[in-house]
Amino acid sequence: MKIRFFLAAIATVAALAACGGGDSGPGFVALPPPQQNEPPPPPPPPPPPPQQSNAKVSGRVTNALDGRGVAQVTVTAAGVSAVTDADGSYSLTEIPPNASVLLSFSKSGMVPQSRATAALAGSGASTVINVPMLPVAVTESFDGQSAHDVVVPGSTAMVRLSANSLRRPDGSAPGGLVTAQVTPIAPANDVNVMPGNYLAAAEGGSAPMESFGALDASFTDADGTPLNLAAGTSATVRIAPSSRSGTLPPSVPLFFYNTTTGLWVQEGSATLQGTAPNQYYEGTVTHFTTWNADQIYNTVRINGCVQDAAGARVAGALVASEGKSYTGLASTLTNANGEFSVAVKRSSSAFVVATTASEISNSPTVEAGDQDISLGGCLQLTRSALSIKLTWGERPRDLDSHTLGANADEHVYYSDKGSLATAPFIALDVDDVDSFGPEVTTFAKLAKNRTYRFYVRNFSGTFDPGQTGSPARVEVSNRGAQTVFSPPAGESGSTDFWHVFDIRTDEACNASVVPVQQFLADPPVSLDTSGNAQYCN
């Protein structure tokens, strides 16, 4: 037995030797040292996050009075700046991705503007911001050592200064004559002329507000150095009322615009004085900027969705609510499912519209109560991306939008508001008979090689003031490009009809807005006498 074990041991050693030796010498295998419970090696570092592309903001700056593009406007956002070209267009392409950025618009002779964008946090995000700017209403020079009133002709707006009340930033007295620039801001005619986004600073963030009129005032000395009120002094401002509300409150808070935060900040109050139509809100201020007679309002939410012409939900669409019975705006973006929830003033009338860079939706009017409400169907972006908005002042009380369609018998107005689903593929949202508007006409489709006509009728038949003095305003949005029309010369007591423009289409249904700008005693007639319009899908 022992001999067998000995032979087996020799065989085992021979087999090991045949396998080769190690560091312990020929014929032997070096076993690894025993493990001492060493920790496992660390995992490899995670890959770097993908580099985000810069955001882009583009748009057009227009003159708020005539809709023409404004060149040489400096546009600044997040440390990036650009200058508008000849037609007012601009593009900022190197904006770091952010939740939102504040855009500032400035040019000599124009009232400064400002607007916060929607979210730009995604890589390569982009948005379109079109902004109207008001020309300065009155510029005058005076001796700052004497008391002085800066009066705006044709308006109740005014700034009253006491003697020797202005100072340079270093506290010194101004050199030479003082130059004042004062401009009333009337948001009831165009809510977009107001700087900012109708948001006031509030505890915990911001709150929506409505405006009853605003005033921009700035002062410089002979060297062009900006001036403001000296410490311990004040000035009186009078703000011309401008509101879509049927009743002006006897007293409202005063807010000034913070150009750093993009929010309105409450400081003081103003009381309603004078006799209509020459009323004004009067208050006392301790510094100059844009001052607004405002109030924060309680809100409810309008819930809904946005879809394209094919019925697919649209994410990232901008949805805005605009007051019809109050002067204010609110906006939001649709989520990944194309859903939105936007604020409106409680117990009010407002309309809601969705836009993308090149499309616009229908604009339903909503009567809000004290509870959140849901729209009956999705807002539908139209392929034509064309809409017309009519606004006006308190008088005449009733102006009417009229659109002549692609076929001879198509007339969209208060008695036949049209349809977006069937011909004429044009719809008027509502007939506003109580001043201000807005009335919005939306085009779902356009026909090939046709001429559409748009005109405004003074249904009230009153001319003190008429459409010119009201003033009436027509804004056309054509695939993101905006054109604004104000009444031309030539209105008289017999010219109820303002033929504003025609829309001409080509074989591909591309639309061109052709100004007409004529007051007429009789309504325009359709240029298309057939009924066989061919629509583009």
Language model region names:
Residues P49, A118-S141, A276-Q279, T284-Q295, ...:
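Extracellular beta-sheet/turn segments enriched in Thr/Pro/Gly and aliphatic residues
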Residues S81, D85-E94, A330-S331, N335-V344, ...:
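Short, surface-exposed beta-strand/beta-hairpin micro-motifs centered on an aromatic residue
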Residues P96-S123, P132-L134, S347-D370:
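A short, solvent-exposed loop/turn motif at the edges and junctions
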Residues D87, N130-G154, A173, A186-D190, ...:
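Proteolytic cleavage junctions
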